[in-house]
């Protein structure tokens, strides 16, 4: 599902996606490009951190953009000629393929809560999905990463993310009034949420489809000053305080994690060939869908981050993520 761009291929100076010959607009981000612009390096002169699997070495933040109109149920006009775009995604006038609104979308339910979901430049579609909700100071974040070699995982991951959000959106259960009872009730709720995600992704395709869709899951609920979280697969939840050390809250279900448990240094394990092979997932062929569940108390301001390996693959350690946040110099979540 991935490919390595040829050295001579033209790439978008804004997002790094491959460009069609003589393209005037990037099909990935929709921004205008010209013959000179397309061949030129990015304005910063810094190498793109997405060129390889090395850690991020430069700030990658960029101004946020609104979600494409098509994501809300209507198609934007053709970027090449302004003509109408048909349901098949192609312009009815010039035949140019329109950017898929699923390739890049954003959500910001509150000024201090937001998310960006992007197609990786080496993938032909965006298989990540996210869902979030805000109710006063209470926040729910959900991220699902579709498994590339399964059928319709981009659809299944989105279905799963929203099914999980629906379960976690109401106030958390209080149990019988004692901490042990409340913890047990919350663990049960996260298990129910994972089961809802499992049903949603399984319903994406007919029963007889071989290699049905599957995805990872992480979810976090910030309730008062406590973060409750769960995980299946190798998507992650990080707590990154403004002061003090950051934490990776979740534990991956992956071959890399098995190597780490066996004594392999994290950087070496995460760079291994099978690093991103997951050992648990949501999907019809999953043997186990019980998530790892945990909680942590928040002691000061900072960031709660839910992400797929599309982000952490380039900045795995909390310190590397904090360097990016600090260098960006913004409190805008987008």
What annotation goes with each model-predicted range?
Residues 1-334:
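PP2C/PPM-type serine/threonine phosphatase catalytic domain
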